[in-house]
Structures are given as C-alpha cells and as structure tokens.
C-alpha cells in the first residue's frame, strides 16, 4: 500500500470525529455572542408585522449550534415560551424546516430525521440510509441515546420493525456504531484477507454471501476499508461499487453503495447527494436541507471543494439557481461562501 494512500487516508479522516465544531465547518461560533441580545432581537422579529424573517435568518445561521441552544434558553427565560414553538408559528415552508432544524442539537436533528423516515406508511429508506451510513461511531452512539430520550423506544427496535431481510441486518449492524476506530497500525495481512473475502463472497461465486459483506463493512475501521477497497481491485475485475451493482438489488444495493461511497470519500458523497437534490426539474428540498443543516459545522468546506471540483460550478451557485427568498438566504449562509 503506498505511503501516498496512507497520507490521503489520514487526511480524509481528519475533522471526521466531529460533533464539536470542526475546522472544516462553514458555520463557526460568533465572536461577540450575546444570547440575551439575540433572544430579544428574535422576539422583536417574531412580533413584527409580517415577521422579520431576515433578522431571524441572520442570527440563527450565523451562530454555532451551542450558541443557538443558549439563545433558545435565554428566549424561554424572557418570554416563558419555547423558541421552537414560537418560530414554528411565525414561519412556514422550507424556511421553517431549516430554522427548526438549526435549533436542534446534531443528535436531536438526526434522531428526528430518522423517526420521520420510519413514521407512518412506508419507510423513507433514502434518508435512513444516508444518516446511518454517514455518521461516526460517536455520533451514532449519541443518536441512539437521544432517540430513546425523545421517543421512549430504541432506534434499533424501530429499524427492525420498519425494514426486512439483509437490508435490516445491515442497518442494524451500522446503527450500533461499533465499527473499529482507526488505529496507527496498518494490518496489511488483514487488508489482503478482507479484500479476498469480499471477492470470494460476491463476484467469484454464484449468489452472494451477504453476511460476510456486512460483517467486514460494518466492523472494520474506515481507514482499513479504504485500503481494502483498493486491494479488492487486484482480485476482482470490477471495483467495489460495480461489484455491489452486480451482486445485490433494491434497498440493500442502495445501502451498500451509499456506505462504500461514504467510506471512500465522505465529502464527495455529500457533494453528489447535494447535486442530485438540485439537478433537473424540481428540488429534493428535504435532502438539500438535511445536508446543509447537518454538515454546516462538520465538513461543509470539504463538501464545497469536492462539489466545485466535480461539477465545475460552486455549490453556492447551484443553491442560488435552485432556491429563492429567505429560504435561499438561509442555505447560502450555511454554505458559507462562493468558490
């Protein structure tokens, strides 16, 4: 395995263990922060005839998540009302969705998105897959804790009752957040063994040994798997993504593809999802909002750079073309600038 690959692997992981604001986030803590003043200004904005959305957007998209929690606390102390409820009544449409998302902690936001993906008839597998495949161990463990707190049931139980077959097994294994952490020692023998096992369990045989794929892809560290997928190419005529498309179908195929893309390059994975949410006619606002809200303090700067590199125009430009009004303003602030 080349040293270059090892360095790239290390670089791709920095800033990844990131519920705390990361160096690659577009939203930073506001320097002259005053929760009381912000709470008062938001209260005035809500009371203004027609609602002063601009002030609400300016404040909440330019504060860190921690600062927003302080504003919500100060607002409740001032008015004896919950800030989220007040804003829910004052705002509507996509802007409301963005602002209410920003008021939740990262784990509360993910937990509520997961719950919504499994509520009612049918499952929104796309959202379930995106969140479960892209979060770190630490993030998943916090999501599990908060999910139980919010909904009085286990995330795993809800996943089990809403999914089936191998797709269920994969989602349950990932949701536990028990993947090995990246170590300083590189085990080349195990890399080779895993690459061969993935090939033997899939492309090489008739039918697929899905449990073998699940165990390797949900238990090994991200850095280890990046090397495994490289090594895999020396055994298989197809790369890992092509092999998945040949071997499995439906939700399971979609989940494995998302997972491998996240492991290979998470910022690029999100750049692709953002592009897909805006290309062609109509916008898949739910996906667009979720990524802009959830990655703004994690790796938005990396996502922007991957987006520009792959699609030739900036993420900022695409958002400008695809959205309008104060909703657009909020997303552009979260994007953090043009490239």
Curated annotation (Swiss-Prot):
Report the transmembrane regions from the record: none
Q: How is it modified after translation?
A: ISGylated.
- Sites where Phosphoserine occurs are at 26, 184
Q: Which Gene3D superfamilies does this chain map to?
A: Annexin
Cellular component terms (Gene Ontology): basement membrane; cytoplasm; endosome; exocytic vesicle; extracellular region; nucleus; plasma membrane; vesicle membrane
Q: Is the keyword Repressor assigned to this protein?
A: no
Q: Name one Pfam family in it.
A: Annexin
Per the record, the GO terms for biological process are:
positive regulation of receptor-mediated endocytosis involved in cholesterol transport
Which positions bear N-acetylserine?
A: 2
> Which UniProt key words apply to this protein?
Acetylation, Annexin, Basement membrane, Calcium, Calcium/phospholipid-binding, Extracellular matrix, Isopeptide bond, Phosphoprotein, Repeat, Secreted, Ubl conjugation
Task: Identify the domain of life.
Answer: Eukaryota
**Cellular location of this protein?**
Secreted, Extracellular space, Extracellular matrix, Basement membrane
The UniProt entry annotates Annexin repeats at 33-104, 105-176, 189-261, 265-336
Q: What is its main location?
A: secreted
Where is the PTM N6-acetyllysine found along the chain? 49, 152, 227
**Which residues constitute the cross-link Glycyl lysine isopeptide (Lys-Gly) (interchain with G-Cter in SUMO1)?**
49
- Quote the PROSITE patterns the UniProt record gives: ANNEXIN_1 (PS00223), ANNEXIN_2 (PS51897)
MF terms from GO for this chain are: calcium ion binding; calcium-dependent phospholipid binding; cytoskeletal protein binding; phosphatidylserine binding; phospholipase inhibitor activity
Q: Which residues carry this modification: Phosphotyrosine?
A: 24, 199
**Which stretches does the entry tag as region S100A10-binding site?**
2-24
Q: What else is known?
A: It may cross-link plasma membrane phospholipids with actin and the cytoskeleton and be involved with exocytosis.
Domain observations: A pair of annexin repeats may form one binding site for calcium and phospholipid.
Question: Its biological function?
Answer: Calcium-regulated membrane-binding protein whose affinity for calcium is greatly enhanced by anionic phospholipids. It binds two calcium ions with high affinity. May be involved in heat-stress response. Inhibits PCSK9-enhanced LDLR degradation, probably reduces PCSK9 protein levels via a translational mechanism but also competes with LDLR for binding with PCSK9. Binds to endosomes damaged by phagocytosis of particulate wear debris and participates in endosomal membrane stabilization, thereby limiting NLRP3 inflammasome activation.
| Self-association and partners | Heterotetramer containing 2 light chains of S100A10/p11 and 2 heavy chains of ANXA2/p36. Interacts with ATP1B1. Interacts with DYSF. Interacts with COCH. Interacts (via repeat Annexin 1) with PCSK9 (via the C-terminal domain); the interaction inhibits the degradation of LDLR. Interacts with CEACAM1 (via the cytoplasmic domain); this interaction is regulated by phosphorylation of CEACAM1. Interacts with APPL2 and APPL1; targets APPL2 to endosomes and acting in parallel to RAB5A. Interacts with S100A4. May interact with UBAP2.
The protein's name is Annexin A2
């Amino acid at each position: 395995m080349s040293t270059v690959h090892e360095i790239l692997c290390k670089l791709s992981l920095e800033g990844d263990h990131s519920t705390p604001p990361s160096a690659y986030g577009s939203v930073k803590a506001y320097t002259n922060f005053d929760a009381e003043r912000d709470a008062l200004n938001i209260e005035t904005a809500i009371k203004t005839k027609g609602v002063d959305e601009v002030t609400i957007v300016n404040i909440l998209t330019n504060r860190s998540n921690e600062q927003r929690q302080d504003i919500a606390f100060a607002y409740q102390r001032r008015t004896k009302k919950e800030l989220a409820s007040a804003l829910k009544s004052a705002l509507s449409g996509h802007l409301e969705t963005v602002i209410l998302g920003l008021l939740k902690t990262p784990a509360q936001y993910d937990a509520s998105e997961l719950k919504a993906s499994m509520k009612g008839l049918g499952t929104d597998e796309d959202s379930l897959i995106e969140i479960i495949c892209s979060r770190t161990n630490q993030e998943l463990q916090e999501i599990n804790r908060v999910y139980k707190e919010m909904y009085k049931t286990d995330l795993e139980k809800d996943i089990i009752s809403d999914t089936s077959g191998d797709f269920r097994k994969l989602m349950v294994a990932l949701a536990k957040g028990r993947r090995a952490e990246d170590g300083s020692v590189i085990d080349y023998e195990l890399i080779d063994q895993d690459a061969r096992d993935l090939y033997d369990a899939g492309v090489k045989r008739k039918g697929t040994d899905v449990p073998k794929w699940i165990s390797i892809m949900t238990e090994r560290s991200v850095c280890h798997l990046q090397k495994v997928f490289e090594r895999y190419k020396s055994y298989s005529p197809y790369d890992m993504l092509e092999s998945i498309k040949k071997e499995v179908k439906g939700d399971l195929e979609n989940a494995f593809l998302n997972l491998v893309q996240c492991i290979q390059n998470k910022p690029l994975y999100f750049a692709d999802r953002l592009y897909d949410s805006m290309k062609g006619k109509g916008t898949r606002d739910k996906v667009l909002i979720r990524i802009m809200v959830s990655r703004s303090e994690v790796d938005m700067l990396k996502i922007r750079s991957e987006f520009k590199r792959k699609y030739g125009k900036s993420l900022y430009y695409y958002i400008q073309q695809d959205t309008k009004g104060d909703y657009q303003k909020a997303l552009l602030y979260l994007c953090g600038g043009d490239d």
